[in-house]
Amino acid sequence: MGSTESSEGRRVSFGVDEEERVRVLQGVRLSENVVNRMKEPSSPPPAPTSSTFGLQDGNLRAPHKESTLPRSGSSGGQQPSGMKEGVKRYEQEHAAIQDKLFQVAKREREAATKHSKASLPTGEGSISHEEQKSVRLARELESREAELRRRDTFYKEQLERIERKNAEMYKLSSEQFHEAASKMESTIKPRRVEPVCSGLQAQILHCYRDRPHEVLLCSDLVKAYQRCVSAAHKG
């Protein structure tokens, strides 16, 4: 909030207590611009701001700031406008420094916390939730694979047993069929079959070969052959 000259003239050191409040450990030095304004002939130089610090129970205690504002001569006149402006600017710059130091200290503390968490070793007792989930899923997968292997073995055994049983049944059925067929053949007597009217059949074939263009001349033989076949069926 101050000018470039005032920002270059400040030198402070700071610390952060347990409530993350910024404590100035060494006093703030006024900038050259503020000092020059306070050295004007109409106003005496301001008294430096003193800060007292102490330790209480091993922790930092808030600084007790005692500011002695410059007064005019023994006559008790009003403070000059230049001095008021310098004090006001000093207070504004001091507040800006406090805020900036607080932000820097907060970022450093967050970075240190993240670094300490990242550097912690992971032991057997501190397995993360994702690792526990992975272990559980791996065990479930192994259990399912074992169950599938057991079922596969069971089904293969059942299939082999069914195939053996079917082969035995086929063999038994084939033996029974051949045995029944043999018995049936033994009960049936063979019958001799002779051609009917074989003489007339030979004459008809000879007539057709000799007279291919006069087949009507063979009609008498055909009629005789038909009568012979009818008589054989009746007899």
From Swiss-Prot:
Query: Pfam families under this entry?
Result: MIC19_MIC25
PANTHER family membership? MICOS COMPLEX SUBUNIT MIC25 (PTHR47609:SF1)
- This chain belongs to which protein, by name? MICOS complex subunit MIC25
Q: Where does the record place the CHCH domain?
A: 194-235
The record's region (Disordered) falls at 31-90, 106-132
Q: Its induction, per UniProt?
A: Down-regulated following genotoxic stress.
The organism sits in which domain of life? Eukaryota
Subunit (UniProt)? Component of the mitochondrial contact site and cristae organizing system (MICOS) complex, composed of at least MICOS10/MIC10, CHCHD3/MIC19, CHCHD6/MIC25, APOOL/MIC27, IMMT/MIC60, APOO/MIC23/MIC26 and MICOS13/MIC13. This complex was also known under the names MINOS or MitOS complex. The MICOS complex associates with mitochondrial outer membrane proteins SAMM50, MTX1 and MTX2 (together described as components of the mitochondrial outer membrane sorting assembly machinery (SAM) complex) and DNAJC11, mitochondrial inner membrane protein TMEM11 and with HSPA9.
The answer to whether the entry has keyword DNA-binding is: no
Q: Which family does it belong to?
A: Belongs to the MICOS complex subunit Mic19 family. Metazoan Mic25 subfamily.
**Motif Cx9C motif 1, residue range(s) on this chain:** 197-207
- Please name the InterPro entries in this protein's record: MIC19/MIC25 (IPR007964), MIC25 (IPR042860)
Per UniProt, which keywords does this protein have? Coiled coil, Disulfide bond, Host-virus interaction, Lipoprotein, Membrane, Mitochondrion, Mitochondrion inner membrane, Myristate, Phosphoprotein
Coiled-coil intervals, chain numbering: 129-176
Find motif (Cx9C motif 2) and give its ranges: 218-228
Lipidation residue positions, type N-myristoyl glycine: 2
**Intracellular or extracellular location(s):** Mitochondrion inner membrane; Mitochondrion
